[in-house]
Curated annotation (Swiss-Prot):
Cellular component GO terms, alphabetical: cytosol; plasma membrane
Keyword Ion transport belongs to the record: no
Gene: waaC
A GO term for molecular function: ADP-heptose-lipopolysaccharide heptosyltransferase activity
Subcellular location: Cell inner membrane
Name assigned to this protein: Lipopolysaccharide heptosyltransferase 1
PANTHER family, per the entry: LIPOPOLYSACCHARIDE HEPTOSYLTRANSFERASE 1, TETRAACYLDISACCHARIDE 4'-KINASE-RELATED
Function text: Glycosyltransferase involved in the biosynthesis of the core oligosaccharide region of lipopolysaccharide (LPS). Catalyzes the addition of the first heptose unit to one 3-deoxy-D-manno-octulosonic acid (Kdo) residue of the Kdo2-lipid A module.
Regulation: Inhibited by ADP-L-glycero-beta-D-gluco-2-deoxy-2-fluoro-heptose (ADP-2F-heptose), a non-cleavable analog of the substrate ADP-L-glycero-beta-D-manno-heptose.
Reaction(s) the record says it catalyses: an alpha-Kdo-(2->4)-alpha-Kdo-(2->6)-lipid A + ADP-L-glycero-beta-D-manno-heptose = an L-alpha-D-Hep-(1->5)-[alpha-Kdo-(2->4)]-alpha-Kdo-(2->6)-lipid A + ADP + H(+); alpha-Kdo-(2->4)-alpha-Kdo-(2->6)-lipid A (E. coli) + ADP-L-glycero-beta-D-manno-heptose = L-alpha-D-Hep-(1->5)-[alpha-Kdo-(2->4)]-alpha-Kdo-(2->6)-lipid A (E. coli) + ADP + H(+)
Keyword hit for Cell membrane: yes
Stretch forming the signal peptide: none
Amino acid sequence: MRVLIVKTSSMGDVLHTLPALTDAQQAIPGIKFDWVVEEGFAQIPSWHAAVERVIPVAIRRWRKAWFSAPIKAERKAFREALQAKNYDAVIDAQGLVKSAALVTRLAHGVKHGMDWQTAREPLASLFYNRKHHIAKQQHAVERTRELFAKSLGYSKPQTQGDYAIAQHFLTNLPTDAGEYAVFLHATTRDDKHWPEEHWRELIGLLADSGIRIKLPWGAPHEEERAKRLAEGFAYVEVLPKMSLEGVARVLAGAKFVVSVDTGLSHLTAALDRPNITVYGPTDPGLIGGYGKNQMVCRAPGNELSQLTANAVKQFIEENAEKAAMI
């Protein structure tokens, strides 16, 4: 059985789709998936054993010059790749009009998605041949697992979902795996940042733990922040610029992770690493970290500036034994 997945973005949403593939793989021996995903996240599906082909799409980039000759050529090549095979099922797990119209509509196969009442954008359901009612009041991972189960005709397991990508990195862990923590300090929204002085204070509080700390970054301003956080601490390393797979490899070898609400926090969860995520204004309820040893540290009054380094250090200590952290 061959299935096409349409789940293009964001990083967290793409990662939250992986447990559904594991369910399907266990329920339907020999099933294989092709996956349409935004080019920036194209490495992620390849980490799952059930994915045979990744079809990158670049809607975010294309829309800036939709009718230019180079973009038209890219769109033509994408359409040819998308339509190269006939699928037993096409599952649109994105639930948006944009992806339904530009991707799902063009694919060859019976198209499945959430119905008018439960799709993220109800109009997207008009592009599906089979519409499934998926209750909204459950975690995003569970919604996607249910969508796959109903689309492919098996019962959704009652056990916790398994991302099944950690093993991809087990044979290529960093040489110092288990000897360091990773601090994920970067996020896209200002109100989701934990103040730099709190990060530095936490780093100082861990001086006697014997653990080293690694700081990844993506954009230049994040690199500058990482350098400020590391200044004066010999046991803190600002990592070089890395691919997503490179960052994943570092996370896979971490003893534990402390993070803000960001896509890499979901990647940590997918890699089964102990992770403390500090939350301020965002609600982790239905979209927060899902998986083993994922811990939520809420800021007083939902204001991250009010969450002290001492409080996070205490949270780490209280959870250290059960999460095998320090």
